[in-house]
């Protein structure tokens, strides 16, 4: 347990940031799930819409420090590859 007042405050701040980051990560996963659901349905138009909604959401998470930029780039690349395969 934190002994000094500043350490106690740091613990509180970390807990608050953890909640925010968990919500952001969950939101990104929800957008990814919508994309995969559209892919499973075979609907190209809804998959494109889901992809266009997913990409800025994950980049927003990168700018907030939730994901590393390479992780986001890899996820976007893989989803784009799946979208392209659907349209062929």
Swiss-Prot record:
The keyword Ribonucleoprotein applies. The keyword Isomerase does not apply. The gene is rpsT. GO terms for biological process: translation. Keywords: Ribonucleoprotein, Ribosomal protein, RNA-binding, rRNA-binding. GO terms for cellular component: small ribosomal subunit. Belongs to the bacterial ribosomal protein bS20 family. Gene3D superfamilies: Ribosomal protein S20. Binds directly to 16S ribosomal RNA. GO terms for molecular function: small ribosomal subunit rRNA binding; structural constituent of ribosome. SUPFAM superfamilies: Ribosomal protein S20 (SSF46992). NCBIfam families: S20. This is Small ribosomal subunit protein bS20. PANTHER family: 30S RIBOSOMAL PROTEIN S20 (PTHR33398), SMALL RIBOSOMAL SUBUNIT PROTEIN BS20C (PTHR33398:SF1).
């Amino acid at each position: 347990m934190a002994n000094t007042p500043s350490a106690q405050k740091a613990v509180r701040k970390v807990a608050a940031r953890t909640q925010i980051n968990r919500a952001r990560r969950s939101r990104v996963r929800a957008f990814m799930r919508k994309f995969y659901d559209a892919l499973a349905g075979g609907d190209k138009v809804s998959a494109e819409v889901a992809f266009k909604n997913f990409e800025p959401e994950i980049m927003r998470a990168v700018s907030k420090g939730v994901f590393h930029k390479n992780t986001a780039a890899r996820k976007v690349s893989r989803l784009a590859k799946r979208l392209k395969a659907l349209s062929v």
